[in-house]
């Protein structure tokens, strides 16, 4: 989520929204398709640590989940705040917040969609960097061990280590990612797919740039997963500085080229990739065409891409946010036209996508 978006939300989130609860569940799903075609349903990462449910933050409603399931999306990337789920480092998870997380997961499962758990913290806890004295790697590993135990070996739940590590040395982030992954595989005994970002907001366009030490593309090649079931997560926007804040698509060709270059890196190293965030305004043909071009890169290279989740939607998103594809009273947002071919065409099902354990 961008700085601009956070400012909009801070002003807009003044009223609570009641969550629609669903008690229905289904047995652990063998996913309908082998590739993720998903949506970020934002809301549980809103506000400050603590906060009141349905006043300061919310989890996705039944209405919203059902809408995106009806459009063919098969995955929800589910952002939330680490500090709410674990109010004290190295201590048990908060029972009430775990309950809300579980309700959201079951609500999504009821529509036969997968869930990506996304601590949306930019490699920070209460403002302090992971791998620092105040938030040591052991604390990050402890958090993931506790969280992973909730869904260990339930393969419709995927573990996204962290949203957009930012302004953190790559060596520091790599150590933290390795320790968290070791805890997931060891202490939690979980073999779920893990999504691993780089630093510098994990941009595809900057994957080979030495921004915080070595380039992501050099350092993250040393990432270690004892379970060997992971994919590298990148984000990519199309505006002037690739931040998603400028409400234009001036760098659309560069954004598509960035995904193509990342595809080559994945293939060269024998890795899998995942496009966790991408989005653009819906009011211009150029933007719609560029979004489709980005989706096409992932769909045309299923030997290395596990799929994508569009940013953004959610019950509390303001209608003025141009990347938002939460439906309006008038109907669908125009960006769906770029995503629809991939949502409806599953002709390659089971053939070309990397297998998910």
Q: Can you say where each PLM-predicted feature lies in the sequence?
A:
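Bacterial N-terminal signal peptides that target proteins for export
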Residues: 2-13
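N-terminal signal peptide c-region/cleavage motif recognized by signal peptidases
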Residues: 22-24
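Boundary of Sec targeting at the N-terminus
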Residues: 28-30
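Active-site mouth of glycoside hydrolases
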Residues: 32-210, 215-217
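Extracellular glycoside hydrolase catalytic/binding regions
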Residues: 57-58, 142, 149, 153-158, ...
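Hydrophobic beta-strand scaffold residues
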Residues: 115-117, 273, 308
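Histidine-bearing beta->alpha loop at or near hydrolase active sites
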Residues: 163-164, 308, 314-316
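C-terminal functional modules
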Residues: 330-357
């Amino acid at each position: 989520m961008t700085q601009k978006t956070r400012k909009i939300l801070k002003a807009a989130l003044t009223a609570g929204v009641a969550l629609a609860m669903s008690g229905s569940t289904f047995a652990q799903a063998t996913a309908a398709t082998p590739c993720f075609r998903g949506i970020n349903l934002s809301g549980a990462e809103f506000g400050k640590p603590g906060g009141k449910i349905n006043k300061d933050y919310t989890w996705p409603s039944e209405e919203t989940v059902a809408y995106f399931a009806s459009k063919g999306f098969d995955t929800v990337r589910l952002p939330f705040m680490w500090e709410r789920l674990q109010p004290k480092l190295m201590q048990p998870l908060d029972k009430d917040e775990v309950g809300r997380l579980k309700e959201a997961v079951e609500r999504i499962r009821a529509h036969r969609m997968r869930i990506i758990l996304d601590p949306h913290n930019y490699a920070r806890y209460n403002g302090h960097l992971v791998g620092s004295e105040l938030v040591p790697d052991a604390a990050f590993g402890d958090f993931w061990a506790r969280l992973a135990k909730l869904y260990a070996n339930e393969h419709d739940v995927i573990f996204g280590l962290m949203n957009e590590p930012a302004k953190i040395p790559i060596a520091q982030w790599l150590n933290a990612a390795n320790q968290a992954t070791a805890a997931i595989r060891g202490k939690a005994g979980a073999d779920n797919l893990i999504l691993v970002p780089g630093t510098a907001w994990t941009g595809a366009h900057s994957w080979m740039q030495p921004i915080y030490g070595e380039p992501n593309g050099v350092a993250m090649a040393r990432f270690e997963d004892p379970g060997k079931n992971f994919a590298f997560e990148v984000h990519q926007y199309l505006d002037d500085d690739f931040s998603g804040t400028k409400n234009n698509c001036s760098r659309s060709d560069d954004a598509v080229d960035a995904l193509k270059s990342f595809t080559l890196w994945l293939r060269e190293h024998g890795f899998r990739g995942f496009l966790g965030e991408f989005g653009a305004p819906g009011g211009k043909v150029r933007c719609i065409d560029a979004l489709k071009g980005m989706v096409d890169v992932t769909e045309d290279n299923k030997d290395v891409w596990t799929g994508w989740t569009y940013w953004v939607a959610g019950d509390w998103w303001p209608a003025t946010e141009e990347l938002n594809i939460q439906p309006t009273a008038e109907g669908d947002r125009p960006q769906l036209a770029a995503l629809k071919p991939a949502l409806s065409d599953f002709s390659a099902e089971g053939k070309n996508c990397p297998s998910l354990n």
